[in-house]
Amino acid sequence: FEILNRVLFDAPGAPVKKALMDAQIGKDIQSSYDNGIMQPVFSVIAQEARDDQEDEFVKILEKNLAKIAKEGIPRRNLLAAFNYYEFKYREANFGRFPKGLMYGLQMYDSWLYDDEKPFIHIKTNEIFKQLREEIENGYFENLIKEYLIDNNHKTIVVMKPKKGLQKIKDQEEADKLKAYKDSLSEEEVKKLVEETK
């Protein structure tokens, strides 16, 4: 799915992201795949989209995914995604984080749910080889169809920010703390201050 995510959304000129951006759905489109949990999740997020764009977002997303699943993903796009991830894998550059720590965290992605396979997320080289062999037989197009188009476990979540909400919450908390402090005697306040130094 990381390969698909790269091809469909992350790579320069990625077709699904481009279609959503061309339709001016939100200010940016982001996607992610999280397989470090019991039930892996693939997400597509339209940042700062308007409420009335929800149906259009879903329609464009599904239409473009269906078109790509039917017509096929260009081989060079898949190979470019493989090259990108293989380079990252071989380079093993985790920035300021130690390699051992990052490898340990990667192991948890599978080890937490299957104690027989702690190294599955580290032994990626074999998987790259197997997946490269699948490029020609429609494997990736079938993944799109089965898991992104025909999946009955998908959901649409619209998050609506409320302007000034944090200020309201901060004021409520300040009022609550003031009321608590006012309920204490001077001696209780001093004791509390001493205990929390």
Predicted stretch roles:
Residues F1, D55-E56, K167-E172:
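Short conserved micro-motifs at the rims of enzyme active sites and ligand-binding pockets
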Residues F1-G13, S43, P98-K117, H121, ...:
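His/Glu-based metal-binding/catalytic segments typifying zinc-dependent metallopeptidases
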Residues K17-E133, N152-K162:
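M16 family metallopeptidases and their MPP-like homologs
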Residues I120-K197:
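Segments forming glycine/polar-rich beta-alpha architectures that bind adenosine-containing cofactors
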